[in-house]
């Protein structure tokens, strides 16, 4: 399998399951450490969930790219608004996504890319 995989999907909650399936297949084909799969799947789900909730446009593009033992998960959406971790109160039912990504990834970032941005996270694989 190539060292990268790309999928363009509807910007909808249902896309998360399809993209997790792509991640599982990619992990297996790239012979990644299966013990790292749950963390990578949660990071992917949070990135996709943020794009679904906060971005604009009908679609989003997800790219998985492996470099050695690092998997970059990148989500390109149509919103120019950059993500920012915030403190969620105990009662809040949302608002922890970027904190989860920060905890589970080696690093994460955001790059402007017209007409929106790419939010990415590097996880061990």
Residue ranges and their predicted role:
Residues 1-6, 51-125:
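Conserved beta-strand-loop-beta-strand hairpin that lines the nucleotide-binding pocket
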Residues 21-45:
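Conserved short strand/loop->alpha-helix "switch" segment adjacent to the catalytic nucleotide/phosphoryl-transfer site
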Residues 6-18:
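STAS-typified acidic loop motif
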Residues 3, 17, 24-28, 56:
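Two-component transmitter module helix at the DHp-CA junction of histidine kinases
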